């Protein structure tokens, strides 16, 4: 897997964050002890919704990191990359919970943002239940999430729906949807923004606004159990930087959008700006990530996709003590 060199430093973000007081050296640093490592490897999966990780560069430098790398890994492959030791932190979705049950040493640390996924369909299809016997396209969205959404409305996720994924190596699923060759598409930003710009289909589910999905985190930050055990100080400082970056995304979406484009993480400013304005990044302060893990684990269990109880998943695959400390420290 290729390593992408550290992105051009977001110098304007430095002044922006500095003006807001974000880049002051946290007073707790002296009591935390020295960093176990000054290198950190974050994911670049080309999704706009993980913007806080993309703009955490200068915040991480203020925390003492000197070598900040972004590793390219598609959404469905980043958990495997983390387990292989190619990443230090990755984006984790509730639909990935089966990997925790399977024994992968994943530790979910915090929720970062809600929403961002949108389900598009052709005319005549108004609800996910109408997709029985239809074909759905996926680029970045994981198949596991599609199965969960199907099960949530009473469909058999194995027998009642078909899907075409970018990982299959065939035609681009988004283009198949635009051309009318498949009936629906489940997308992460910037895919929904592109479909709207091309006037393709209509939205039948938006996880930012539609219950129950809007009540829980979509993207969470995870690391490996080994990394957290060996680097507790680094773990807390990375999490602090990413959570502060989420606050910046909420406060200055247009300026953050410019930094993401100039940093090479995305190409279309309008798509990025729309995404950042739509996602309520400030919700990390209000929502409980354990509720999210419980919700997804229960739904996966009810759908027959996992056997473990939510309690076991939470016990085996989460560590909230860093977040609890930062919630007290960063209280507005």
Protein language model regions, located:
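Short, glycine-/small- and polar/acidic-enriched structural segments
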Residues: 31-179, 183-189, 204-205, 215
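Secondary-structure end/capping motifs
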Residues: 229-308
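Phosphate-coordinating loops and pocket residues in cytosolic domains that bind phosphorylated ligands
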Residues: 12, 133, 197
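Conserved C-terminal helix/tail region of periplasmic/extracytoplasmic solute-binding proteins
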Residues: 301-332
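Short, solvent-exposed loop/beta-turn-alpha elements that line the ligand-binding surface or hinge
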Residues: 64, 209-214, 281-289
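N-terminal secretory signal peptides and thylakoid transit peptides that target proteins
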Residues: 1-18
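Pocket-lining segment of extracytoplasmic ligand-binding domains
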Residues: 94-95, 171-262
């Amino acid at each position: 897997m290729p390593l992408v060199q550290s992105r051009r430093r977001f110098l304007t973000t430095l002044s922006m964050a500095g003006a807001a007081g974000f880049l002051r050296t946290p007073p707790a640093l002296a009591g935390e002890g020295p960093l176990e490592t000054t290198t950190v490897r974050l994911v670049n999966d080309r999704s706009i919704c993980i913007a806080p990780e993309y703009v955490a560069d200068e915040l991480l430098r203020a925390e003492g990191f000197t070598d900040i790398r972004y590793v390219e890994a598609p959404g469905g492959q980043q958990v495997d990359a983390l387990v292989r030791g190619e990443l230090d932190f990755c984006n984790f979705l509730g639909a990935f919970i089966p990997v925790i049950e399977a024994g992968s040493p994943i530790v979910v640390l915090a929720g970062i943002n809600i929403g961002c996924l949108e389900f598009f369909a052709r005319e005549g299809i108004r609800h996910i239940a109408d997709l029985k016997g239809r074909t759905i396209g996926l680029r970045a969205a994981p198949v596991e999430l599609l199965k969960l959404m199907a099960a949530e409305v009473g469909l058999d996720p194995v027998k009642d729906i078909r899907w075409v994924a970018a990982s299959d190596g065939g035609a681009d699923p988004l283009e198949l949807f635009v051309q009318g060759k498949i009936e629906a598409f489940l997308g992460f930003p910037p895919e929904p923004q592109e479909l709207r710009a091309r006037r393709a289909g209509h939205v039948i589910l938006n996880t930012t606004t539609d219950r129950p999905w809007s009540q829980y985190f979509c993207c969470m930050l995870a690391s490996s159990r080994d990394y957290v055990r060996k680097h507790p100080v680094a773990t807390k400082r990375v999490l602090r930087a990413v959570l502060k970056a989420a606050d910046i995304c909420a406060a200055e979406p247009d300026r953050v959008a410019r930094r993401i484009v100039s940093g090479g993480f995305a190409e279309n400013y309008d798509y990025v700006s729309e995404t950042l304005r739509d996602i309520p990044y400030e919700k990390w302060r209000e929502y409980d990530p354990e509720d999210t893990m419980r919700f997804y684990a229960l739904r996966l269990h009810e759908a027959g996709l996992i056997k473990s109880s939510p309690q076991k998943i939470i016990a085996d695959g989460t560590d909230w003590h860093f977040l609890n400390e930062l919630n007290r420290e960063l209280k507005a």
